[in-house]
Amino acid sequence: MFSDFLSLMFTAALMTLGLAVCSLLLGLFLSLIFAVLEANRFVGKPMTVFVALLRGLPEIIVVLLVYFGSTELVEMLTGEYIEFGAFGCGVLALSLIFAAYASQTLRGAIQAIPKGQWESGAALGLSKSYTFIHIVMPQVWRHALPGLSTQWLVLLKDTALVSLIGVDDLMHQADLINTNTHQPFTWYGIAALIYLAVTLISQVGIRKLELRFTRFERGVK
């Protein structure tokens, strides 16, 4: 019995990891869009208000609004009732939360790039988009890595929130097993150890990335 429950926990851990990775990828994409739009003179202010709203709301509220509100919003716009899956809504909600904070990190990293980089690109006849993607962004990721790493660790722990909307993640599985066994300390403890293991492995990976991204700076010193 114990081994069966333990197998379910590890399966749920894979679901949690998949949820976190999907949210990270979508969140990075959204955070870049948010950072660019906030710098735009036409939509900058509304975008700033939207990001501030995401940052100001409790994260569980964002998850619930996305899960219950997405169906109502689509029905309002199209007149059709479409029920969205809990996993997809969880990914979207966590991505929005991640992007609200990561966009500020990216925005600061973009502003840290010397204007001479843009001017050099223009002098070489490169378009602004080419300069941004191929010259500016590689440097932006290096500057933003410490902040983004912290947000990734927060995101890993925030995945526990989606258990409330029915995603079969680690916390949801721990709840179900505890209901059957009445051993909360055992199963929540195992869940905590799995979260801790993933976090520690992530920290090692982040450290290696930081060393790789700064190898040229360390070589100059």
Curated annotation (Swiss-Prot):
Q: Where are the transmembrane segments?
A: 17-37, 49-69, 82-102, 121-141, 186-206
Q: Known InterPro entries for this protein?
A: AA_ABC_transptr_permease_3TM, ABC_transp_permease_HisMQ, MetI-like, MetI-like_sf
**Residues in domain ABC transmembrane type-1?**
13-206
Q: Which UniProt keywords apply?
A: Amino-acid transport, Cell inner membrane, Cell membrane, Membrane, Transmembrane, Transmembrane helix, Transport
Concerning SUPFAM superfamilies, the annotation shows: MetI-like
- Does the keyword section mention Ribosomal protein? no
Mainly resides where? membrane
Q: Which GO terms describe its biological process?
A: amino acid transport
Localization, per the record, is: Cell inner membrane
A GO cellular component annotated for this chain's UniProt record is: plasma membrane
Q: What Pfam families does this protein map onto?
A: BPD_transp_1
Q: How does it sit in the membrane?
A: Multi-pass membrane protein
Q: Name one GO molecular function term.
A: transmembrane transporter activity
| Keyword Transport found | yes
Report the function annotation for this chain.
Answer: Part of the ABC transporter complex ArtPIQM involved in arginine transport. Probably responsible for the translocation of the substrate across the membrane.
Q: Which NCBIfam families match?
A: HEQRo_perm_3TM, PRK11123.1
The entry sums up its family as follows: Belongs to the binding-protein-dependent transport system permease family. HisMQ subfamily.
What is its quaternary makeup?
The complex is composed of two ATP-binding proteins (ArtP), two transmembrane proteins (ArtM and ArtQ) and a solute-binding protein (ArtI).
Name of this chain's protein: Arginine ABC transporter permease protein ArtQ
Which organism was this protein described from?
A: Haemophilus influenzae (strain ATCC 51907 / DSM 11121 / KW20 / Rd)
